[in-house]
Amino acid sequence: MARDYYDILGVSRSADPDELKRSYRRLARKYHPDVNKEPGAEDKFKEINKAYETLSDPQMRGRYDQFGEAGVSSAAGAGYQDFGDFGGFADIFETFFSGFGGSPQSGRRRSGPARGEDLRFDLKLKFREAVFGGEQQIRISHLESCKTCEGTGAKPGTRPQTCSTCQGSGQVRRMTRTPLGNFTQVSVCPTCNGQGQVVTEKCDSCGGRGQNQVSKKLQIKIPAGVDTGTRLRVSNEGDAGQKGGPPGDLYVYLFVQEDSEFRRDGTNVLSEFKISYLQAILGAQLPVKTVDGEETITIPAGTQPGTVLTLENHGVPRLGNPVSRGDHLITVIIDIPNRISTEERELLVQLASIRAEQTGKGGIEGFLGGIFGR
């Protein structure tokens, strides 16, 4: 399965356009083929480009957030972006070394509200459920803010204290001397785990975590036309945020089960339909199964094996535009019997004589071969 575009760019799903651009430029500098000659760098560069091209467009980003790659136009491609504003090698050098020092405020970890983690749920659908959509009830388990301590983790009547090790910054710094100069190494505070605060009297309900694991049922709306790999976003149903931060989202990944009668090719439904050799020769009006139910199909006289008949607008609705549907393509399979009655054989021999066909050693098979080999 393809990697998540947000993970490729190393940003959260709530990242604003400026944050997306900064991350994109940083990664593009790192993996640009003119700079990075390592194997796989060019493929990584194209992957970064595709992710940014999708997420930098508000409309495409919205479709990606809702449906994943299935909702994004295939035109969002892996072409190179314009690098005219990168500032050359000096800019790349500056980017590379910016993580080793610089302003005391650079890379400062915020100890304030933090968004909750996103969650994933895999959901299996039957073929027709994927075609027409509908609603599915699922049960998930996620973290919710503790109602007793209101998410602080502290016992009611008390409050978290500022960490004395990092003075509330969530980070500790260490100066390192190198031949290139002095550099400041920044790491997460081991006392408060980067939170900037410590809980001295823990809440009895959540054990000081500020969150509890809760199981709940959700009603999920499945759009018509989804397929394996389609991803649906359910806002605010991920894990609860910390310190009043917003909850994450729930991402439902869909997997469509195989069907005994139908297959799918894009928005077209494919199936096979077996008819007798007489129906193929004479033609017929026959009932055939479709995803919409039973329909009548016309078999033209002289239909050949492997003929594909089309039922228009009986395919899969287009994702996001259910009014538009594909077609149902039916491949005709002609059933030639291994055994026939004496009466049938006599009649077929007469037909062969009328057509001046030679039955040959195989008997009537020569006649049938003459018909179906045209």
Swiss-Prot record:
Primary residence: cytoplasm
PANTHER family named among the record's database cross-references: CHAPERONE PROTEIN DNAJ A6, CHLOROPLASTIC, DNAJ HOMOLOG 1, MITOCHONDRIAL-RELATED
Cofactor(s) listed: Zn(2+)
PROSITE patterns: DNAJ_1, DNAJ_2, ZF_CR
High-level lineage: Bacteria, Bacillati, Cyanobacteriota, Cyanophyceae, Acaryochloridales
Family designation: Belongs to the DnaJ family.
Role, per record: Participates actively in the response to hyperosmotic and heat shock by preventing the aggregation of stress-denatured proteins and by disaggregating proteins, also in an autonomous, DnaK-independent fashion. Unfolded proteins bind initially to DnaJ; upon interaction with the DnaJ-bound protein, DnaK hydrolyzes its bound ATP, resulting in the formation of a stable complex. GrpE releases ADP from DnaK; ATP binding to DnaK triggers the release of the substrate protein, thus completing the reaction cycle.
Binding site for Zn(2+) 2: C163, C166, C189, C192
A GO CC annotation given for this chain: cytoplasm
CXXCXGXG motif repeats mapped onto the chain: 146-153, 163-170, 189-196, 203-210
Compartmental location: Cytoplasm
GO BP, sorted A to Z: chaperone cofactor-dependent protein refolding; DNA replication; protein refolding; response to heat
Residue sites binding Zn(2+) 1 per the record: C146, C149, C203, C206
Organism: Acaryochloris marina (strain MBIC 11017)
Name the UniProt record assigns to this protein: Chaperone protein DnaJ
Subunit structure: Homodimer.
Gene3D superfamilies membership: DnaJ domain (1.10.287.110), Heat shock protein DnaJ, cysteine-rich domain (2.10.230.10), Urease metallochaperone UreE, N-terminal domain (2.60.260.20)
